[in-house]
């Protein structure tokens, strides 16, 4: 049972050395982290994550065993042919890694005073730039045929944008097109995107503040879907942004303000 990130090249290599495709099961768990090693392992890594399997021509007993393992680890089985798999992961995994690394590369040599101005937008877009070079050199090289047309289109789109930077209408259309693309990403548990309220809360940068905030959430009986934390350089405060339903956001805002917390107005967006 194979769990590598690229399927076609591995299948070809296996056939080249004379191993029957009937006893080789190509799979790929779509779960991982930007850091590696046993110390980075998580017991819940595969839970509710897609696990791709190409069972074409594979022995039924081996397929059954693979399905049982995937189910045991809590993942969601997705049947997909190896060629389609490589094209799909080139778009949703490999191209994002390349673009994130390219963006982070632009920061090299930048003045520290500039970098001190960065917020969650920059950190979010370069997070996976911290990935392991030795792993990604193999992934990108192995799937280069699927990556090249995507990267070429990305470069072409960037060059087109470069020629339109003084055209406000074109820039607006460019940003709107990105909004449409982002909206295509499935929401929680693979379902439809939901509208969340993002509630910013200023907290003191001292021990126990985050735990105290979560205690207040429990008291208010609200469900926190996600959160982000920002630290301002040179400041003794941090900004916690909680993602909640509109109803829970209103409830928590009232509750926290009554308790003396510094709560800003919530903003809504679809996730």
Question: Which residues are covered by each model-predicted region?
Answer:
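Rossmann-like NAD(P)(H) cofactor-binding subdomain of soluble oxidoreductases
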Residues: 1-38
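Internal alpha-helical scaffold of NAD(P)-dependent oxidoreductase catalytic cores
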Residues: 45-130
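Interdomain hinge/lid region at the active-site interface
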Residues: 111-179, 196-199
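Generic structural signal for residues in well-ordered beta-strands
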Residues: 24, 77-78, 263
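Short, ordered loop/turn segments at secondary-structure junctions
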Residues: 29-30, 58, 82-83, 229-230, ...
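Short, conserved loop/helix-junction motifs that constitute active-site signature segments
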Residues: 17-19, 44-47
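A conserved regulatory-domain signal marking ACT and ACT-like small-molecule sensing domains
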Residues: 181-271
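Short, well-ordered coil/turn elements that cap or connect secondary structure elements
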Residues: 19-21, 72, 219, 258
């Amino acid at each position: 049972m194979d769990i590598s990130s690229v399927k076609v090249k591995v299948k070809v290599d296996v056939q080249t050395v004379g191993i029957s495709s009937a006893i080789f099961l190509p799979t790929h768990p779509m779960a991982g982290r930007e850091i590696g090693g046993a110390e980075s392992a998580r017991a819940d890594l595969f839970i509710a994550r897609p696990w791709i399997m190409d069972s074409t021509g594979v022995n039924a007993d081996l397929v059954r065993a693979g399905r049982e393992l995937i189910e045991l680890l809590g993942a969601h089985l997705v049947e997909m042919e190896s060629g389609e798999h490589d094209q799909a992961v080139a778009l949703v995994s490999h191209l994002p890694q390349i673009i994130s690394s390219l963006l982070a590369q632009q920061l090299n040599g930048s003045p520290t005073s500039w970098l001190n101005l960065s917020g969650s937008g920059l950190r979010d877009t370069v997070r996976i730039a911290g990935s392991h070079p030795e792993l990604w050199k193999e992934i990108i090289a192995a799937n280069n045929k699927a990556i090249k047309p995507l990267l070429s289109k990305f470069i072409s789109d960037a060059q087109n944008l470069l020629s339109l930077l003084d055209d406000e209408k074109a820039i607006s259309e460019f940003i709107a097109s990105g909004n449409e693309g982002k909206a295509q990403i499935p929401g929680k548990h693979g379902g439809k995107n939901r509208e969340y309220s993002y509630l910013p809360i200023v907290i003191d940068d001292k021990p126990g503040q985050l735990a105290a905030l979560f205690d207040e959430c429990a008291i208010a009986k609200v469900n926190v879907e996600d959160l982000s934390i920002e630290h301002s350089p040179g400041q003794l405060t941090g900004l916690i942004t909680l993602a909640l339903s509109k109803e829970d956001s209103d409830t928590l805002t009232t509750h926290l303000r009554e308790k003396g917390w510094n709560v800003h107005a919530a903003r809504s967006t679809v996730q």
